[in-house]
């Protein structure tokens, strides 16, 4: 069980995200992380650590941020380490994941992903597949990736060249989207 969130807006994104993750911490307190898209460079920076959201808050800087995603983790695949904490980043793709990808070992073998993975999680496999299929069209990459995944999941995804857009998809696992004006 994990807590995931995505946010884009005009508020102080970092504080909104970290405050929301503290509310979601009951869903997982083994590790926490956020990915933030810098307003000037559009580069996605990942901050993550084994431990609580309060530990994460201490390592995050306060640049102006366009959009972000965040995660609290209850470890299911892989130990409680900084490397296994979310978000996971592969190429232009950054994501957070809740659920279980049952066929992640087969996908690692089928797509020869072992050399590029940095964690022991099923989640990073989804990031690697998305990056594999990403050719400039996020929806097409998501569609192709999801067709390969078996299990229950919710994903919140950032693409580096889509500065103020957040994508989300789910299979069985719940996800809520809100638009505030």
Language model features: what each stretch is:
Residues 1-181:
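Conserved short alpha-helical segments that host acidic/polar catalytic motifs at enzyme active sites
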């Amino acid at each position: 069980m994990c807590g995931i969130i995505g946010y884009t807006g005009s508020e102080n994104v970092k504080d909104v995200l970290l405050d929301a993750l503290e509310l979601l911490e009951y869903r997982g307190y083994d590790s926490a992380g956020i990915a933030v898209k810098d307003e000037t460079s559009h580069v996605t920076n990942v901050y993550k650590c084994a431990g609580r959201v309060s530990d994460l808050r201490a390592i995050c800087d306060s640049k102006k941020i366009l959009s972000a995603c965040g995660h609290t983790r209850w470890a299911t695949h892989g130990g409680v380490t900084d490397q296994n904490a979310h978000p996971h980043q592969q190429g232009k793709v950054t994501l957070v994941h809740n659920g279980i990808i049952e066929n992640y070992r087969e996908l690692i073998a089928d797509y020869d992903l072992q050399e590029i993975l940095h964690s022991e999680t099923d989640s990073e496999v989804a990031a690697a597949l998305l990056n594999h299929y990403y050719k400039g069209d996020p929806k097409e990459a998501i569609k192709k990736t999801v067709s390969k995944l078996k299990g229950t999941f919710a994903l919140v995804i950032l693409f580096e060249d889509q500065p103020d857009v957040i994508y989300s998809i789910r299979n069985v696992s719940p996800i809520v989207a809100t638009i505030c004006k």
